[in-house]
């Protein structure tokens, strides 16, 4: 690009000089050709200034290495080769001095590149002891520790930053494992509670023994109920006869008379025969009835049941 610009500038310059010479030779006293020559000269000057500015910007952007390479392409002088070899040797020495162990962003030197720091066992042990005592250092402690270990303060600071990051990562892993076990324990507890809830619901849905025992006497009572076919009433076996039942069945009132007749028969069977005069007189019959009643009470009870 620069060669093209130079050739263009030289071509314009030669064209301008040629034009000026022709104009001067053809008509040296003419005033109309002088503005054209001045315009051409101004254009050539502008192009040269632009080329100089572009060359300066390229030199600043490329840097030392790029400038040396450009100079090496432009000219094969021994001075440029010596400068290139010295720059490469300096770079190799810097790489040899830098170790592998701790990332170091050395901002004090102004290089801005990432380097590796190799620590010895003694240096690592001292740094570990200091980290156990203080996880962070103030500037004075940082400088004192760097002077003690033969390091730069920036290297000590970066080592402490990395050590804190590793400690935080380990603590995060421990917390994650603890939370995982706690979640598993909560899941087991939740399953157990769900099982207990299902058992309680099944127990609530099933009939209780108290209700079953309460239903059983009602069934037995229903089995002992009797129905009168005439009055169509249901009554238990031990319930007393109702008045309406007696009205419907006046024949039940003859139970006492039949019982007295049976008592008289028993008395006759026992040898207590009423005399003939007592058979026709009510008083004597009543006395005989009382005597037979006492005999009936003394005898074994006779159970009579009337079926309707």
UniProtKB/Swiss-Prot annotation:
Q: Which UniProt keywords apply?
A: DNA-binding, Homeobox, Nucleus, Transcription, Transcription regulation
Q: Where is the composition biased (Low complexity)?
A: 74-88
* Region listing for Leucine-zipper, in residue ranges: 170-214
Q: Which InterPro entries match?
A: HD, HD-ZIP_Homeobox_LZ_Class_II, Homeobox_CS, Homeodomain-like_sf, HTH_motif, Leu_zip_homeo
Q: Which PROSITE patterns match?
A: HOMEOBOX_1, HOMEOBOX_2
Q: Which domain of life is it from?
A: Eukaryota
UniProt-annotated stretches for the region Disordered? 15-36, 71-117
UniProt DNA-binding region: 112-171
| Alphabetized GO MF terms | DNA-binding transcription factor activity, RNA polymerase II-specific; sequence-specific DNA binding
Which PANTHER family does its entry note?
Answer: HOMEOBOX-LEUCINE ZIPPER PROTEIN HAT14 (PTHR45714), HOMEOBOX-LEUCINE ZIPPER PROTEIN HOX2 (PTHR45714:SF7)
Describe the subunit structure.
Homodimer. May form a heterodimer with HOX1, HOX3 or HOX7.
Q: What does this protein do?
A: Probable transcription factor that binds to the DNA sequence 5'-CAAT[GC]ATTG-3'.
Kindly provide the name given to this protein in its UniProt entry. Answer: Homeobox-leucine zipper protein HOX2
| Source organism of the structure | Oryza sativa subsp. japonica (Rice)
